[in-house]
Amino acid sequence: MDDGHQESALYDGHYEGDFWLFNNSSDNSQENKRFLKFKEVFLPCVYLVVFVFGLLGNSLVLIIYIFYQKLRTLTDVFLLNLPLADLVFVCTLPFWAYAGTYEWVFGTVMCKTLRGMYTMNFYVSMLTLTCITVDRFIVVVQATKAFNRQAKWKIWGQVICLLIWVVSLLVSLPQIIYGHVQDIDKLICQYHSEEISTMVLVIQMTLGFFLPLLTMILCYSGIIKTLLHARNFQKHKSLKIIFLVVAVFLLTQTPFNLAMLIQSTSWEYYTITSFKYAIVVTEAIAYFRACLNPVLYAFVGLKFRKNVWKLMKDIGCLSHLGVSSQWKSSEDSSKTCSASHNVETTSMFQL
């Protein structure tokens, strides 16, 4: 087996290469067999967990924004685009879970389509997170200008979201073009192209990690500086949520991207079993971003939580729980508190 084919057989991470990690049929050692067994059980389980919670959370966000919450601001536009991308992303996972347990039985067209959908929506999600960060910076740090231009910026938000989808589709084309089904002990849907593998890795690391990370550092630094000068009882809550957003991004995305970066420096890392485990586990951690986004970017908003209660009331959940009056009291209290918020803090939480 030549080096190019061996790499195709060994490495298949969703973010860069082929779907099946280190699936080398020529390596029959007990250590490698244990790793393959672990991967074939662990990854499908993770995919299904992320699928279930991601489907529920992102579907709820979409329902609220479509039926209960009008798109009045630029933030609303981005917060609609984010769950849409994450929802399509998680809907590809059951196919990979089945293929991980058995083999790829869905054909070449579905292989290309699902690889393209998976990659495109990953980029859409990460670029939308970047736009949300910039939007929050503008709204909090330049509150007066932001308030006066919300209607105009809403239109720009729709244009930006369209551009995000177009750019994400373009950078996903290698997955569609070079995705194919190959028989290596069993049928697998994989992607490999030595000619552009380095370019794909650079684009992936830039758009999927470094750009969002750098944007978060710069924008949230400005937001924190502004909030520290604000005299408002919600200031500390604002800072906690900012730190939570950054911490979740770092904890879920840094390990896998760091492992990918290290692995790209030497072929030896492709053959080290402990590093194979590291890639699989950190990749699984990165997937949980799709479950956490609804919590971080929607559920923290007072307006969103109120609309969730309205949805529950409409479908008859609250009448059996006897909490309508309790929610009414809480809602009135929230309105009183909201009236005392300054522009910065209101902009931060009225998502």
From Swiss-Prot:
For membrane topology, the record states: Multi-pass membrane protein
Which sequence ranges are listed under topological domain Extracellular?
1-41, 99-112, 174-196, 269-284
Glycosylation: residue positions? N23, N24
Topological region Cytoplasmic = 69-77, 135-152, 225-240, 303-351
ATP-binding as a keyword of this entry, yes or no, is no
The answer to keyword Membrane applying to this record is yes
Protein purpose: Receptor for the C-X-C chemokine CXCL16.
What protein does this entry describe? Answer: C-X-C chemokine receptor type 6
Organism of origin is Mus musculus
